[in-house]
From Swiss-Prot:
Cited function: Formation of pseudouridine at positions 38, 39 and 40 in the anticodon stem and loop of transfer RNAs.
Protein name per its UniProtKB record: tRNA pseudouridine synthase A
Native organism: Prochlorococcus marinus (strain MIT 9215)
Gene: truA
Keyword vocabulary terms for this entry: Isomerase, tRNA processing
Residues annotated as catalytic: 52 (nucleophile)
Catalytic activity from the UniProt record: uridine(38/39/40) in tRNA = pseudouridine(38/39/40) in tRNA
Lineage of the species this protein comes from: Bacteria, Bacillati, Cyanobacteriota, Cyanophyceae, Synechococcales
InterPro entries attached to this UniProt entry: PsdUridine_synth_cat_dom_sf, PsdUridine_synth_TruA, PsdUridine_synth_TruA_a/b_dom, PsdUridine_synth_TruA_C, TruA/RsuA/RluB/E/F_N
Length: 268
């Protein structure tokens, strides 16, 4: 039995998230169906992050165990011939059986893209939130967001329906920058709560539009005022960029290799 890791890219617009569920098309379901065609038996997959419906991934990490003579590096080409064009395997490698796509990850990186331009742009419409009513003050947004760095209880930024035991997580870094009309919100954390990034972005946009102050933003999450956190950014602007491990298992470790070219600027 060997363990194979996949570097996966998908357009979340077409799927009801990563995780398999009844009466919905998900990325995990499609991927496991393709693996079944190869092996003729059920293969369970595990992902670094469980993206929600409509959320994209430029560098999702997945692993599965399989008893096969097919070398690990061959699965990328084999799977790409079976998968729809909205799911691509960028790389496949054999890894140690002790390595786990989820539990071995040191942190995950999500990026949210806001199109703050006056006019819509069809070429990025499905990968960004067109919030154009007011010019956003990204400096105010960054100042407010920096208070969340470190280990905190983010109960206010967790949608109902989560099965997590607690709402404490460690945010390693938050960066917000403007690249012309685009505002890029990058969050790196050891783990993310259900709907966390979209709720954070929804509140930060209110700060950027000066509808609420930084103090109000901070008060809402520090004092767990979940009922005051009502605005959630649309799913289409969110992308799971990658998961980082103590040892790189893929050759494609440069984000620029697989993140949409028009959204690369400002990557760190």
């Amino acid at each position: 039995m060997k363990r194979v890791a996949l570097l996966v890219q998908y357009d979340g617009y077409h799927y009801s998230g990563w995780q398999k569920q009844k009466n919905a098309t998900t990325v995990q379901e499609i991927l496991e169906s393709a693996l079944f065609k190869i092996t003729n038996h059920t293969v369970k997959t595990f992902a670094a992050g469980r993206t929600d419906a409509g959320v994209h991934a430029s560098g999702q990490v997945v692993h599965f165990d399989i008893d096969s003579v097919i070398p690990g590096f061959s699965y990328s080409n084999i799977l790409n011939n079976l998968l729809p064009s909205t799911i691509r395997i960028l790389e496949s490698v054999e890894v140690k059986n002790s390595w786990h796509a989820c539990y071995s990850a040191v942190y995950r990186h999500y990026r949210y893209v806001i199109n703050n331009g006056k006019f819509p742009n069809l070429f990025i419409n499905n990968w960004s939130w067109h919030r154009y009513q007011k010019v956003l003050d990204e400096v105010l947004m960054l100042h407010a967001s920096k208070t969340m760095e470190g280990e905190h209880d983010f109960f206010a930024f967790q949608k109902s329906g989560s099965n997590r035991r607690n709402s404490v997580t460690l945010i390693k870094n938050i960066d917000i920058k403007r690249v012309e009309d685009l505002i890029l919100v990058d969050i790196k954390a050891t783990g993310f709560l259900y709907g966390m990034v979209r709720l954070i972005v929804g509140q930060l946009v209110l700060v950027g539009e000066k509808k609420i102050s930084s103090d109000i933003f901070i008060d809402r999450w520090v004092n767990k005022k979940k009922n005051d956190v009502k605005e959630s950014a649309p799913a289409k602007g969110l992308c799971f960029v990658n998961a980082v491990y103590e040892e790189n298992v893929f050759k494609k470790v440069n984000n620029n290799d697989f993140f949409p070219l028009f959204l690369i600027n400002g990557f760190s």
